[in-house]
Curated annotation (Swiss-Prot):
Gene3D superfamilies: RbsD-like domain. It comes from Caldanaerobacter subterraneus subsp. tengcongensis (strain DSM 15242 / JCM 11007 / NBRC 100824 / MB4). SUPFAM superfamilies: RbsD-like. The keyword Flavoprotein does not apply. Its EC number is 5.4.99.62. This is D-ribose pyranase. It catalyses: beta-D-ribopyranose = beta-D-ribofuranose. Pathway: Carbohydrate metabolism; D-ribose degradation; D-ribose 5-phosphate from beta-D-ribopyranose: step 1/2. Belongs to the RbsD / FucU family. RbsD subfamily.
Amino acid sequence: MKKTELLNSEISEVVARLGHKDLLVIADSGLPIPDNVKRIDIALTKGIPSFRDTLNTVLTELGVEKAYVAREMIDKNKKLYLELSEQFGDKLVIIDHEQLKEMCKNAKAVIRTGEYTPYANIVLESGVEF
């Protein structure tokens, strides 16, 4: 059995296959996911699993160079925005929500959580750990 926190085999496989600059999205329950992008749907019900729990677990295995969130999060989900700002520092990049949705088209996968708060989406750009 794995010793790390991330137990979901689909997510773990995607993370293991990411190369430098590849994109992985962690999404709330409402973000549209392009048909051509791998969907890993772990949503059970409203709020379960949460965006934060999912993100923090994925980050136990993923090195991140940049993290992109929608500008709309600043006003519509300020608490989450402040938490992510503290967590990612200057790696956090603010873009428009429409740009974020466009980036999803190039993602290796989108992880759909049960998160039920507005604009709780992040595009993670894989970094290099050496």
